Amino acid sequence: MAPISSTRPSHSIAADNPNPTTQVNFNTNMTETTIFYKSHNPGGESILLIHGGFSDGSEWDGVWPLLAEHNYHLLLPDMPSHGNSVDIHPFEIDDTVRRLAALIKAEARGGLAHVVGISIGGHIAAALASQHPSCVLSLIVSGFNIFTPNLFTPVLPLFVYGVQRGSGFARQPFAEWDRFCRGLGSLALTQDVFNILISSRELQTIECRTLVVAATRPGVSADNIDHSRRLFETVVAGNGSQVVQHRGMRHPWNEEEPKVFADMVKRWIITQELPDGFEVIP
């Protein structure tokens, strides 16, 4: 049987339409613009998949069907200023976390979900687990990179935006840049993304069982192991959490290797050994 998907607004889950789009407002303030999400295969244990920058929930199209085969319920939001949530501004951590926590509490089975985030979505996922530990069963963060502000930080978003709109000399080194070059990034969103990536904010404690992944295949899109370690230092010890790397994967490996990514997610959730190629970072 094909995975069942949701198409109705408000808090209902419909099982009668194979082409899902769900848009819903979980807040008492009914004038607030609604966040968009898709719900696939309701009824099973829930997994929330949080996409990267300049993207949307369709980034997971290669991953979610593989998880639905194992009877998981998949929630795929479009974050503020992205995809079908493009009219929600600005894109910032606390507001996005608030919206996603409301989504989990309203639509996930039992108000609980395993949370998976990649790249900018990893920043959101980590903050979600920190700020709303009661609704996160486990956490996977891949591609977490955070940089220290410097003198060039205020002008960097404008420079990058200008390069994309102008000479185009950069050659799409990673998924976010590829999407950006296809016109999926406004100047405002570019500034919001850089405010998350380049920040001196203090990372908050994460209590749940957590897997931090660095995709370290050599090249400009390799994740920074030190940044992965920094995030892992916020995870409470003694609950089976791990920080690992995969030397054969690049930053956007959820799109490039969806079968491996889905297998990793499934194994982490059921506490099995990770697939071949993952090695613990000392």
From Swiss-Prot:
The protein's annotated pathway: Mycotoxin biosynthesis
Keywords attached to this entry: Hydrolase
SUPFAM superfamilies: alpha/beta-Hydrolases
Keyword Hydrolase among UniProt keywords: yes
Residue intervals passing through the bilayer: none
GO MF term set: hydrolase activity
EC number(s) recorded for this UniProt protein: 3.-.-.-
Region feature Disordered, mapped onto this chain: 1-22
Annotated AB hydrolase-1 domain residues: 22-270
Top-level taxon of origin: Eukaryota
Bias kind Polar residues: ranges: 1-10
Presence of keyword Hydrolase: yes
InterPro entries in the cross-refs: AB_hydrolase_1, AB_hydrolase_fold, AB_hydrolase_sf
EC class of the enzyme, as a word: hydrolase
Its job: AB hydrolase superfamily protein; part of the gene cluster that mediates the biosynthesis of gramillins A and B, bicyclic lipopeptides that induce cell death in maize leaves but not in wheat leaves. The nonribosomal peptide synthetase GRA1 incorporates respectively a glutamic adic (Glu), a leucine (Leu), a serine (Ser), a hydroxyglutamine (HOGln), a 2-amino decanoic acid, and 2 cysteins (CysB and CysA). The biosynthesis of 2-amino decanoic acid incorporated in gramillins could be initiated by a fatty acid synthase composed of the alpha and beta subunits FGSG_00036 and FGSG_11656.
Family recorded in the similarity comment: Belongs to the AB hydrolase superfamily.
The protein's name: AB hydrolase superfamily protein FGSG_00045
